[in-house]
Amino acid sequence: MSEIALTVSMLALVAVLGLWMGNWKIYGVGLGIGGVLFGGIIVGHFAQSWQLNLNGDMLHFIQEFGLILFVYTIGIQVGPGFFSSLRVSGLRLNGFAILLVLVGGLVAAVVHKLFAVPLPIILGVFSGAVTNTPALGAGQQILTDLGSDPALVDRMGMGYAMAYPFGICGILLVMWLIRLFFRINIEQEAQAFASSLGNQRELLHTMNVAVRNPNLQGMAIKNVPLLNGEDIICSRLKRGDLLMVPAPLEKLELGDYLHLVGKRESLENARLVIGEEVDVSLSTRGTELQVVRAVVTNEKVLGSKIRDLNLKQKYDVVISRLNRSGVELVAGSNVTLQFGDILNLVGRPESIEAVAAIVGNAQQKLQQVQMLPVFIGIGLGVLLGSIPLFIPGFPAALRLGLAGGPLVAALILGRIGSIGKLYWFMPPSANLALRELGIVLFLAVVGLKSGGNFVDTLINGEGLAWIGYGALITAIPLFSVGVLARMVGKMNYLTLSGMLAGSMTDPPALAFANGLHPTSGAAALSYATVYPLAMFLRIMSPQLLAVLFWAM
């Protein structure tokens, strides 16, 4: 068998064995995707024992490309909500996440100096203790740039593997200890979160209002500021027994009924100006009007503002609301359309059909991946990651690297959504497939490289000490920040659990946190809020530690 064929076969064997091991559960907790690392260690151990020669250049390429795929797809997934997550409560949650990362880096630095642990080893232990694989890749890259011994750089994977198991279990233990320490009642926490969410979330509401203000008599709808802004949509008008779509030039009459869509405060302001709220049905049932949902899939309208489509004048159709990534928005005239937006259309059937054709409404396109933007994004990310950042006094330039560059590029492109006919929307199933493929390839190679000396290091070397260092790096930041967030920040326990899982970028911990209460979405919401920034900081922190301690 050729060297390349043997290398591919070994990678496939590692993936099969590792994914199988990852499915093992002990009290509901498993290694998950981390099982691939240990599958690689096992195969790597026997590969060295049997003197099998694998292609080093091929392994290096697969490792780096797998890492790029993983971080890029993460960025595309969370990009649309990343910047908005930094507002309001997101600032508070991300503040604790930043503190947790800083404390973890501080503990790693203290262990490095106190116990004279070699820099590559402590960076590997640090990455494993926080269960962050891209951090391992970033640490290996910066050490290579600094001129570290390649053999020592490869030993980072062993440090990672030693610390990883307690990294997975340690966060679950900390969640349990905090719950025990504060005597927390999960049901009460879920009810408190639901109550606070109801007060904070600005959902869209509807209101039927009768025109009673004589000043509006004979005034065209387009001339009524409240009905022509960005906060309220007037989707239906009823005059007598006639229900119609209100055209901009339609003149209001006293006694008209308007169906308004918007936020509660805006609707109350409109009611005060227009007249009074009435309990009158403006349903389209039994009329010539329909309400139909259509999804934006036509590249020609991507980036267009709703007003540019001129739907009211041309087709007598109004967009009553817009759903983007599960969030309902007021369909104001200045809203820019993005791929995958779901529009609520109100109008006659033939008109709605024409508008649906304009916006696309091709459901099958939501399951297709536009590959050109994927490689444009990866290319831009690699270029961005290669830009050196020179800081006075540092022995080497900092770079976002192959882990940080594609992540930042994907976050920005995911937020932009589309440029011309190019769109960065990726179906969840495709995103998950590419992400899992990337992390499996990366971990498989790391495991293969580490496996040759793993058993000897664990039994005869410093493996047990590395496990202890990893336990300190895992537990101290989690417990200290968790207690601080609960005592000082008065943070809801379910929200706290999700924040801890997101700060560690740890999906198994999120699964555990979600299982604390079957119906509350508190943990998932806080996890998603802190995950993007935490991932970015996790990638940068080993680079900063490497540069700071390289010359010391």
From Swiss-Prot:
Keywords: Cell membrane, Membrane, Repeat, Transmembrane, Transmembrane helix, Transport. The chain crosses the membrane at residues 4-24, 26-46, 65-85, 96-116, 117-137, 158-178, 371-391, 393-413, 439-459, 464-484, 493-513, 530-550. It is found in: Cell membrane. Residues 192-276, 279-361 form the RCK C-terminal domain. GO terms for biological process: potassium ion transport. InterPro entries: AAE_transporter, RCK_C, RCK_C_sf, Transpt_YidE_put, YidE_YbjL. GO terms for cellular component: plasma membrane. Belongs to the AAE transporter (TC 2.A.81) family. YidE subfamily. This is Putative transport protein Spro_0050.
